[in-house]
Design a protein with these regions (language model features):
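Basic, alpha-helical terminal appendages of large translation-related enzymes
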Residues: 1-11, 56, 128-137, 149-166, ...
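N-terminal, positively charged nucleic-acid-binding surface of large information/translation enzymes
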Residues: 2-209
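Structured secondary-structure scaffolds
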Residues: 3-55, 107-111, 177-404, 446-450, ...
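Alpha-helical scaffold segments in carbohydrate-active enzymes
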Residues: 111-118, 264-267, 390-401, 426, ...
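A glycine-rich phosphate-binding loop feature that marks nucleotide/adenosyl-phosphate handling sites
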Residues: 132-137, 325-328, 377-379, 411-418, ...
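Extended, non-catalytic structural segments that build the interaction scaffolds
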Residues: 145-157, 294, 374-387, 429-448
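Active-site-proximal binding-pocket segments
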Residues: 300, 365, 369, 378, ...
């Protein structure tokens, strides 16, 4: 059994990868970096620890300028538009950030430029003449993402100049076969220019020593170590007019900005400063604080090698404690594609099935180790079975029975039987497993623990037949309902990080006092006599017709025929 991965401190800085402000959020984003981080942070807070969840939109780089070009608007207009959209998407999904910032804010520019200057003063940068692709047709040097070509490693013909999306390898534009402009498709030529390089190779030994003892997900650690083996210095400036200006008087710095993957992770620091101007150092400089970065696997190299190297070079900040990266989420056997519109967007999913169903369904497919396929039919059928039929039904039958047979007051128990003790022992075992799994980032196993406990409590209730006991053995009926109420309280604590909105409604129906996780998962004798409220049904099933409609929608999108808003409006919205 894996050890409980829970550092002996009480201060945690949790971050989710900063989403590019160039489009809305889809289920792949949610499953990879945002829902797992939200579940994890909610649990830490429930445990009573000082934990903050920091995020914000990444608003620089060629991903932004390219998207703005395609939409026919300025980069500023684009990021303003999508910052608001992304923030709303997260709110709809119940993703709760303590602070959600932007990398175009003044505090971020100041923090990034100070960071750059410190590394510059310490000798970690070197100005080099390099040959870079120039587009005669467009009359300018092209940054890496403005260049596409064939990946030299896997042969993917649409690889970007910075990374191949298919095999995940980091690339330099000059490595591409048959490079061309991503905008015009025109051929390119190499010309000489100047850029500042981060001397990553000088930190190779430090990175290896730091990484070798890390108790991380195996695939994350292996990826990082393999990348460090072949580490090379990287240019951290770009020829762009959108971004954080290089803060040097050098004439060669004119018209250059910081590479987006240099300034973006500094956004974690600037957002924390913005949120807690008087306490931010408690999270970034106190060696007892733990920083945990939730990301997708395409960002592993940046968060496990380049970002730690930047922090090492700076010398004043904590290094990441853990980087629980997740793999990719596929959809109905196909790769998600925002450009082709093949995705399920956060807002349409919540508007269709509600926040709780959406969160639960996505959590079932968090790609913790390998790329995972989200099957919409299976997802909704499992959610119906596990969340609605098991947990939701348990809550309804226990509270309804107390209201109907005990005047809405939790009965006082009598002596426990061996069957009662067996249930309590099973509860204790499941709670321990759940906590261990969740804190080791095994979110799907923790979710399974919650469901299995819910099923066991349902069986206990069903087999005791309280509707007969209340007539034939009232004292025994009181004990069964007291224990059922207590068990419902306990299992609700396990479901809380996954479906917080509905669980908080349940706690209100149960008239439970505020408390921490450790309080919730214990039997509380003082709740005997507690007056509960009239309860309402927590969840509604996703009906077969709606499941079929979703399958049809995705089949159309898979055929590169993005469904129109008129077609989508035909889907019944029942929340």
């Amino acid at each position: 059994m894996a050890p409980l991965k829970f550092p002996p401190v009480n201060r945690y800085l949790i971050t989710s990868a900063l989403p590019y402000a160039n489009g809305p959020i889809h289920i792949g984003h949610l499953a990879g970096a945002y829902l797992p981080a939200d579940i994890y942070t909610r649990f830490l807070k429930f445990k009573g620890f000082d934990a903050i969840h920091i995020c914000g939109t990444d608003e620089h780089g060629v991903a932004i300028t390219l998207a703005a070009y395609k939409e026919g608007i300025s980069p500023r207009q684009l990021v303003d538009k999508y910052h608001d959209r992304i923030k709303k998407d997260f709110e709809l999904m119940g993703i709760e950030f303590d602070h959600f910032s932007r990398t175009t804010r003044k505090i971020h520019y100041e923090t990034s430029q100070k960071f750059f200057l410190r590394l510059h003063e310490k000798g970690y940068f070197e100005k080099r003449k390099v040959k870079q692709f120039y587009s005669p047709q467009e009359g300018k040097f092209l940054p890496d993402r403005y260049i596409i070509g064939t990946c030299p490693y896997c042969g993917y013909e649409e690889a970007r100049g910075d990374q191949c999306e298919k095999c995940g390898r980091q690339l330099e534009p000059t490595q591409l076969i048959n490079p061309r402009s991503a905008i015009s498709g025109s051929s390119l030529e190499l010309r000489e220019t100047v850029h500042w390089f981060f001397k990553l190779s000088s930190l190779k030994r430090e990175l290896e020593e730091w990484l070798k003892d890390k108790d991380w997900k195996p695939f994350v650690k292996e990826f990082a170590l393999s990348w460090v083996e072949e580490i090379e210095d990287r240019a951290i400036t770009r020829d762009l007019d959108w971004g954080v200006p290089v803060p040097l008087e050098d004439p060669d710095a004119k018209g250059k900005v910081l590479y987006v993957w240099f300034d973006a992770p500094i956004g974690y620091i600037s957002a924390t400063i913005e949120y807690l101007p008087d306490r931010w150092e408690d999270y970034w400089k106190d060696p007892q604080a733990k920083i945990i970065h939730f990301i997708g696997k395409d960002n592993i190299v940046f968060h496990t090698v380049i970002w730690p190297a930047m922090l090492m070079a700076h010398g004043e900040y904590n290094l990441p404690y853990d980087v629980p990266a997740n793999a990719f989420l596929n959809l109905m056997g196909r790769k998600l594609s925002t450009s082709r519109g093949y995705a399920i967007w956060a807002d349409e999913l919540v508007n269709s099935v509600g926040q709780d169903i959406a969160r639960y369904a996505i959590a079932l497919y968090i790609p913790e180790k390998d790329d995972t396929d989200f099957n919409v039919r299976e997802a909704f059928e499992r959610t119906n079975s596990e969340l609605v039929d098991s947990f939701g039904n348990l809550a309804h039958r226990v509270l309804s029975f107390i209201n109907a047979n005990f005047g809405g007051r939790v009965p006082h128990p009598n002596s426990l039987t061996s069957e009662d003790e067996e249930l309590l022992n099973y509860i204790s075992e499941k709670v321990s497993n759940y906590e261990r799994n969740l804190l080791n980032y095994n979110f799907r196993l923790a979710q399974k623990d919650a469901v299995e406990l819910s099923n066991a409590i349902n069986r206990y209730f069903e087999h005791r037949r309280p509707w007969k006991l209340v007539k034939e053995n009232p004292d025994r009926a009181k004990t069964v309902l007291f224990l059922s109420y207590q068990a419902l309280k306990i299992v609700s604590a396990l479901f809380y990080p996954y479906v917080p909105n509905s669980v908080m409604k349940l706690w209100d129906y149960m008239n439970l006092p505020a408390g921490k996780f450790d309080d919730f998962v214990k039997v509380s004798p003082d709740l005997a006599g507690n007056t509960i409220k009239e309860s309402k049904v927590l969840y509604r099933k996703v009906e077969e017709d709606k499941i079929n409609e979703w399958v049809d929608i995705l089949n159309k999108r898979a055929g590169n025929e993005r469904i129109s808003i008129e077609d989508f409006k035909k889907v019944k919205m029942v929340i």
